[in-house]
Structure formats: C-alpha cells, structure tokens
Amino acid sequence: MRIDVVTIFPDYLRPLELALVGRAASRDLVDIQTHDLRAWTHDVHRTVDDSPYGGGPGMVMRPEPWDAALRDIVARDPSRRPRVVVPTPAGVPFTQSYAAELAEQDWLIFCCGRYEGIDGRVVDAWADDEISIGDYVLAGGEVATLVMVEAVTRLLPGVVGNAESIIDDSFAHGLLEGPVYTRPPVWEGRAVPEILRSGDHAAIARWRREEALRRTCRRRPELLDRIELSDADRAVVASTIVAAHGGGDDPPVTGVEDAVTIAERGTIGDGPAPSGCASSHCS
C-alpha cells in the first residue's frame, strides 16, 4: 500500500517512522510519504490560508496549494487512482470496519487541514472520504491521520506477526475485547481468573465471549444493536443488567428464557434500565 500525507507540519508525522508502522515501512509492506503543503505555494510568505468568506473567526486553507499538491502527487503514478481522505470533526465516524475498508485500498492520500479547515471546493473536488475520529476538535488533521494510518497499516498482510491478534481485537466481532492477563498468576493479591489457566480452550473461548459482552454492555451498549446475539449471549447481557441493578426485586436469572424475558422487558424490578447499558438488548 502507498500512503501520502499532505500537511503544513511534516514533522508531526514522524511517529509513523516508529514501532509497528515504521517496521512495516522498513519491510516495504507500506510506503508512507509526507509532503509539505507549503511547497506548492508561490509567494514569499508561503501562504496557505486566508480569511473566510461570510466573516467569522479564524482562517481557511486556500484551494490553490491543495489542488496543486494533489494534482502533482497523483500525477506521479498515473496508472492508479488514490482514495483521498480528509480528517475532520464534521466527518463520518471512523470505525474498525472503516479501517478494514481503507486497508483494502491500494493508495491513500490524507489531507491534514488546519485553522478552520480546507476550502470546501477542494473537498468537493478531491475528497472521497471525510472522516472523524471522535466528537471533539483538534488543532489539525495530523493526529487523526496518525490514528487512521496506524489502524489501517496493522491490518495489512504481514504487518502484525500473529494474525490472530487482529482477529481477537476489540470490534473485530462487533464487541469490545475483554480483559487480558499475563504472569505472575497472583499480583498484589489479585489472581488471574482460574479458567484462563485451565487449558480448556472451549471454556476459555466462552469466558472471553462473555467478558466481551459484559464490557460492551457496560461501556458501549449501542454496539450490541449492531450484532446478532445468541440466546446464550442475551443471557449474559441480561445478567449484566441484573448486576447493574443490584438484583432489584426480580428472582435470579436461572436460564435463557428468564434472561430473554428480562432483556426484552427492559426493566428489572421497578427501576429503569441502567444508564451503563442502554442498547435495545439492555433496555
């Protein structure tokens, strides 16, 4: 894969030379090039911004340098067409599935805006994707680009030594990954769950699935609405609700039918569904 990044702060992207992404580049699994947008300016001050039409605070990045930069970069490999990405808080959310989609591409160009953003005409003319990494505002697109490039690169074949690491990632199956443990077996009085030391691979897989369901229900309940849950999964979700309510006035969940009834009813005892688990499976 080829990745080009256009920015007014090329040094901001130097972390891409380190760790996993840096090793991938050194092994020619990905070719990452950064470009200084100011190289495509033609005035003594190397100006890339101007005041916004319609008034308002801040400055807007001018279209001419961006268009010149993108034309020049694309012309260097006319046999391929890149997918152009603009990081912006006004974009669609970046997700693991989005990372997987981008990882299927042959060539990506990231356009790192600054100030109030890039002139909308450039975005309309060039951008294939406008992507947000979260509901907050950064000073520019560089940090978001670092996030996306790492998320995409680690999905490329051969980048991660153990491919199962990717399969077991948070979000790989639509759920958050559960807790992980290593040696020593007991630390500061806290023991590793016995099941993980049992050698029973089927039981360990079930435990991990259940922990992933519990963590997702507590922290990102909306994710549960996007996946198909088995009856056993729904039992775990329902028991998580019961625990969040301290049991309420309901009898214990003793089987799948009880769990499904509770999950579909949406309340336990006379209390509302817990704020920590607000998906349709949990509330």
Swiss-Prot record:
Quaternary structure and interacting proteins, as annotated: Homodimer.
NCBIfam families, A to Z: PRK00026.1, trmD
Location in the cell: Cytoplasm
Primary subcellular site in the record, as a coarse category: cytoplasm
Catalytic function, reaction form: guanosine(37) in tRNA + S-adenosyl-L-methionine = N(1)-methylguanosine(37) in tRNA + S-adenosyl-L-homocysteine + H(+)
Gene3D superfamilies: 3.40.1280.10, tRNA(m1g37)methyltransferase, domain 2 (1.10.1270.20)
Cited HAMAP family: TrmD
Job of this protein: Specifically methylates guanosine-37 in various tRNAs.
PANTHER family recorded: TRNA (GUANINE-N(1)-)-METHYLTRANSFERASE (PTHR46417:SF1)
One GO biological process term: tRNA N1-guanine methylation
Keywords carried by this UniProt record: Cytoplasm, Methyltransferase, S-adenosyl-L-methionine, Transferase, tRNA processing
Name the UniProt record assigns to this protein: tRNA (guanine-N(1)-)-methyltransferase
Binding site for S-adenosyl-L-methionine: 113, 133-138
Record-linked InterPro entries: Alpha/beta_knot_MTases, tRNA_m1G_MeTrfase_C_sf, tRNA_m1G_MeTrfase_TrmD, tRNA_m1G_MTases_N, tRNA_MeTrfase_TRMD/TRM10
Keyword S-adenosyl-L-methionine: yes
An example molecular function term from Gene Ontology annotations: tRNA (guanine(37)-N1)-methyltransferase activity
